[in-house]
Amino acid sequence: MVDHITDRDRRYTLFMLVVVFTSSHVDRQIMGILGQPIKDSLQISDTQLGLLTGIMFAVFYATLGMPMAMWADRNNRRNLISFSVFLWSLMTALCAAATNFVQLLLMRIGVGVGEAGSNPPSHSIIADLYPPEKRSTAMAIFGTGVNWGILIGFLVGGWINEWYGWRIAFLVVGLPGILIALLVRFTVKEPPRGYSESLVPEVAPPPFWSVVRYIWSNPVLRNVVAAGTLTAFSGYAAVIWVPIYLVRIHELGTGEAGTYLALTIGAGGAIGIYLGGRLADYLGEKYGEQWLAWVVTIAGLLSIPFMFLCFFASTSGMAILAYSLPAFMGTIYVACSFALIQNHTPLEMRSVCAAINLFIMNIIGLGLGPFTIGLFSDVFASSMGVDALRYALLVTLVAIAFGSWFYYRTGVWVRRVRGLTQT
């Protein structure tokens, strides 16, 4: 740990955390563009595909995230992130050797175990580097890793699959992560805790269940966790199943589908999350912190009709065009949620609060989102045939609607809480 962080150190650390977050989402989301070829090659069902991309990955990813976050609140966060990148990258590369469902499932669980140690300490480091008035923008920049990961995963994975097959695609995206792990370990500085706010922890990090009780008793945290979880349910389900929908129903190749989605979800979504974070910081500073939540409410409600049009489009062009707006705004919630949680959490609880939020978000969002769509698709298939996937995807619209409501409630509570603290 160092005692002083320069502006250059701050920018470089954030850049490397974005690279790490990008790598995790390349390795996580590549299953979306490779889903149909893997299904055909290994002869698995949509439910099994949902298990690979959802709940089995998420259970280990989310469950191990909490003890790793508690460790990070007491020890070196940079070293934990470095080890995590190495592990998930190795397990992604090993997916290339899988010859059946069980083997691939075990490799994907390994990816989840590796990724469990990255996000909570990253959030904590960013909170130490950037003060509250700049935190939404910093979290937005960090959150663009989701979209850059999708861009690289879909673009590289889609075309490598068409040229060399899905196994080589796993090798190509997995192995570079080992270099990233080394760069984090030897070039990133561990910042002092509370550095951005000139604070030091007044007490030792509290026990886990004390943090759980704190979150439950805090209406802002309670509502933003519910809101983010429901929005993540829709987002994770869509990012896995929309590529499969385009390949299966609209008969696009994985390279073509990956290119279109890399541009819409990847590049468009990255711009959206960054601008959303900047807008949230601007509105929050000018009109009140509640706008960090209300920006997401507006984005969610605007997305619903366009997603419906996407799922029932008669051509691939219409589907991709309709999906462009939801893709642009779909990850705005990431920066705003992360910033609100850090803003309303005591210094000594930040990593664990982030981990608890991610646990719930990932078990329900990442875990049940893709799995639920796969299950419904199999259930509807006997009566609807190939169109079963269209109707299964409607579940995502319900999740967005409820998520938008909880973001609205979050903003209401933020306004009340800030009003009380100022009187």
Q: Whereabouts are the PLM-identified features?
A:
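Cytoplasmic helix-loop-helix junction between adjacent transmembrane helices
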Residues: 107-148
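Helix-loop-helix hairpin linking two adjacent transmembrane segments in secondary transporters
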Residues: 142, 146-186, 190
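Conserved MFS/SLC helix-loop-helix module at the cytosolic interface between two early adjacent transmembrane helices
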Residues: 63-102
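Helix-breaking motifs and short loop linkers at transmembrane-helix boundaries and internal kinks
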Residues: 43, 76, 97-103, 131, ...
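Multi-pass alpha-helical transporter architecture, strongest
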Residues: 183-187, 304-306, 310-313, 394-423
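Juxtamembrane intracellular "pre-TM" segments in multi-pass secondary transporters
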Residues: 2-6, 192-225, 249
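Extracellular/periplasmic helix-loop-helix junction of adjacent transmembrane segments
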Residues: 34-63
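Extracytoplasmic gate region of multi-pass secondary transporters
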Residues: 31-32, 219-274, 330-334, 338, ...
